[in-house]
Amino acid sequence: PEIVFGKFKLLSNVSDEVNVMLARVLAFVVVLVLSVIGNALYLHYRRKVRIKGHNYSIQIEYGDLLEMHACKKVIDFDECFTTTVGGAPSDINPDSICGQYLEKNPIQDMQSLIDNVHLKPAKSKSKFQGKERYDSGKLVPNGECLLMAFAKLDKDGRGWFFSREEFLDCLSILWNEIDKYYGQKDVCIS
């Protein structure tokens, strides 16, 4: 493409070789800038990513979990399945996914939902008021939602997250639980 670059005279007071070199650098910069802008737009506007493997397909979508349809939605609760939404440290934050879910779908009797699936409490009690707690990853179906015991509670009722090993154990339990309850539907997890 010497001919293409030779047609452009960017500076009239320099040799043709310098003009060709400047035209090449300018073309490179233009292509680079357009590539960066195109990639930035793609990353900004993409809404989903699909990961496929042997015997599974995971689709990661960006959006409001509570607005998803035709799927089972996993809503994470604390280890005691607290249903009180409010501002106290032991309450569910109204801005969290769990808080938004509970405000749209109040649960009057969580214990009956737990009893209906014969979910056994964990061997130890919660650090928060010695309440019954459930292993992280265990699910309780409620309509199109699967309510998951997740965050452990400290003595003040605040949720905290566990070590890498405990997190992996939680995921292992979760996958087994999903296998029981998903009913051949897609599953959306926050």
Predicted regions and their residues:
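Macrodomain-like recognition of ADP-ribose-binding/processing modules
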Residues: 1-188
